[in-house]
Amino acid sequence: MQTTAQQQALSLQNPCVAFMFSYQQKDLSKMLELCDSSGTVEFVPLGEAGKGKIGELGKTIWGLLIDCFPDIDNTLDAAVAEDSNTVRCQVVIRGTQEKDFADIPNQGKHFDSDHIFIFHLNQNHKIDHIRVWWNHDDFKRQLGA
């Protein structure tokens, strides 16, 4: 039998797990539906250029990843409720490049990269902030850049 705290933690994880599943399905619309329309995103390795609105910068980057890496996939290794509104997901993302991506010319190479997504949910259980970390130098190295 689950405790109330365990049930709350599972409930909190659901939008975040659903977001990662939607990403795995390449369903950008569903990913964005799980987010607050005024939510923010930080792709930490990109510095200031990696900060913006989920529905603008997030939509653009995830859309480009799905387009340039059509076999993109992810494995959710862990989802941990850090507090009542925050979930940390440990994810492995992989894919084979088929188009130029940002400053990385297409060489048809494959990447396999550990990522950390930290999701914050608002009172309406919508994702209102996402912070994403990965080793960008290793990502570029795997793609031959």
Which residues make up each language-model segment?
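Low-complexity, intrinsically disordered terminal/linker segments enriched in charged
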Residues: K126-A145
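A solvent-exposed, acidic/Ser-Thr-rich amphipathic alpha-helical stretch
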Residues: A9-L10, K30-V87
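Short beta-strand segments enriched in hydrophobic/aromatic residues
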Residues: C35, I93-G95, W133-W134
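Hydrophobic/aromatic beta-strand elements that line small-molecule binding cavities or substrate pockets
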Residues: T75-V80, D114-H120, R131
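Short solvent-exposed loop/turn micro-motifs enriched in small/polar/acidic residues
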Residues: N14, D71-D73, F111-S113
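Short, low-complexity N-terminal intrinsically disordered segments enriched in polar/charged residues
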Residues: M1-S37, V41
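Exposed beta-sheet edge and beta->alpha loop/turn motif
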Residues: V92-Q123
